[in-house]
Amino acid sequence: MPIQILPPQLANQIAAGEVVERPASVVKELVENSLDAGASRIDIDIERGGAKLIRIRDNGCGIGKDDLALALARHATSKISSLEDLEAILSMGFRGEALASISSVSRLILTSRTAEQNEAWQAYAEGRDMAVTIKPAAHPVGSTLEVLDLFYNTPARRKFMRTEKTEFGHIDEVVRRIALARFDVAINLSHNGKLMRQYRAAPDPSQHERRLASICGPAFLQHALAISWQHGDLTIRGWVADPAASRTLSEMQYCYVNNRMMRDRLINHAIRQAYQDLLKDDQQPAYVLYLDIDPHQVDVNVHPAKHEVRFHQARLVHDFIYQAVTTVLQQTATPLLNINEDGEEIEAPRWQPENRVAAGANKYAQPEPANTVPVVRTSSPERTATTERSIARERTPTYHAGEPYQKQQGELYRQLVQPAAVNKPAAVSQPSAASAPVARQISTDEPLHGDNYSFGRVLTVFPPCYALIEYKQGIALLELTVAERWLKQAQLNPPAEGLRPQPLLIPLKLTLDKNEATACQRHQKLLATMGIELAVEHTRATLRAVSLPLRQQNLQKLIPELLGYLSQHEEISPDALATWISRHLGSEHEVWNVSQAIQLLTDVERLCPQLVKSPPAGLLQPIDIKAALATLTHE
């Protein structure tokens, strides 16, 4: 068979295979078009589960007569006109395929009128070439789309449709998701002439809980914990159910990105990880969450039905969601009870979001003092739903960042998961070739401030790891891998509260021998101080989190070596352990460039100013310029 161009109807039917899966898909596409048209009221009429009729009526801006024919054509849209528009999508639709695809597998009639027109017009496509016919009609300002006899000309697709009840159930779920996304729009859903759902508009934030209760039910609202976090251009808001209620509300999982309903695996993983110690493996969390992000930082054009997105900074988004949900759950969780040596019950310590000195003398993002509310406990289990919600709202912390989102430099990510420097750096331990129980420390007579000490300007880098720098009115060679090891050790020296663990995207499973498992259990507190969360069961271990300096390391190799080292010591200090780890970390760069060298030295000068004043052996080698000049001048 020779290559030939497909007829328009066949091409549209092929495209419909991706967009129009069932009647619920048609409802989703058409209602999203109504939302893009600025409608404040949408009426949805369904007959026989959508197989016989789907009618969507809205009071949006309408479509002009001259645009009606194009509205049913493929790749025709008013949403975008350039690649720049595609990279910053805010509208629900943008491909211009939905109406053409739907009209190719049904009898579609589009009636519309704009405020500027005196009369309405009706359009429908028919025939092998999908020719569009336009005629006058009576209609108020807005649009009505009628989809009759869905899949009438594709018997194979119609055969796979389920029962009327099942198909309407899917439509009901789609409408529920859309109603949760747009509180300001009134939506009515009817089936076979009977009004099934009536979601009244709730434009005022104080009315949102009423809409939430009508969609998710009073049981979810009673156990809902309000959440509202902001960091730069990232904002997350909504509700999460407390763990006790999540066990019976697991079907309530709604997530939106820029008001677009999503089933994104990264977001689901972050939420699930926040609940991981509060739910069993077969239980699921319940939540209604809205993530707002700069549209330039998310790609929505990666799924035919736009159910999934791709984030440019996936790790940032994952950790941001995890931290937000974890904080709310920790603040509202019931304290666990431990038994002390005297047999008395004592309250276990609970993690609280706080500003603390962490790895490398840094701080976590500062919350506004006005939003800091102490945790409220009550011994009475009979609190009303209103009281629960008001307390949850008061407890909800909102974090702000002063600098805008930086895609290239990842500045926001470092602010989120890495704390900011303080003026007085901690003393740095001297690396030693021998694994000494206690590392020797460099001391200074007076406090050092990073702003007053600098190695000098980086001139160039000699591969693989030597930087030529200006140094004390001359030049010197600096070994970057040695400087990197000093920096890692400074970041690994734990403060009194310990290093902050950063959850792994995928927990690491390890198989340990008997000595390693014993060492892990014996030094569990020490590992926690280093920000390492390692759960051991017999000879199996699960690594769930590590401190920030270890995030980019080969943990599959490093952790067993670390446990082997710990098995040789009954007791060991955190400083000695930090020294050992820093000497066994791999370099982040095989071959360094100038920008990487500048960034490294900037961090070293900030966290380890002692190295500038008294460089240790192996770090810096001054170059005798006078001897070189004497050779050139034959002196």
From Swiss-Prot:
This is DNA mismatch repair protein MutL. This protein is involved in the repair of mismatches in DNA. It is required for dam-dependent methyl-directed DNA mismatch repair. May act as a 'molecular matchmaker', a protein that promotes the formation of a stable complex between two or more DNA-binding proteins in an ATP-dependent manner without itself being part of a final effector complex. GO terms for molecular function: ATP binding; ATP hydrolysis activity; ATP-dependent DNA damage sensor activity; mismatched DNA binding. The gene is mutL. It holds the Pfam family HATPase_c_3. Gene3D superfamilies: 3.30.230.10, Histidine kinase-like ATPase, C-terminal domain (3.30.565.10), MutL, C-terminal domain, dimerisation subdomain (3.30.1540.20), MutL, C-terminal domain, regulatory subdomain (3.30.1370.100). Residues 369-389 are annotated as: Disordered. Transmembrane segments: none annotated. It comes from Yersinia enterocolitica serotype O:8 / biotype 1B (strain NCTC 13174 / 8081). The lineage of its organism: Bacteria, Pseudomonadati, Pseudomonadota, Gammaproteobacteria, Enterobacterales. Residues 377-389 have a biased composition (Polar residues). PANTHER family: DNA MISMATCH REPAIR PROTEIN MLH, PMS, MUTL, DNA MISMATCH REPAIR PROTEIN MLH1. InterPro entries: DNA_mismatch_repair_CS (IPR014762), DNA_mismatch_repair_MutL (IPR020667), DNA_mismatch_S5_2-like (IPR013507), HATPase_C_sf (IPR036890), MutL/Mlh/PMS (IPR002099), MutL/Mlh/Pms-like (IPR038973), MutL_C (IPR014790), MutL_C_dimsub (IPR042120). One of its GO terms (biological process) is mismatch repair.
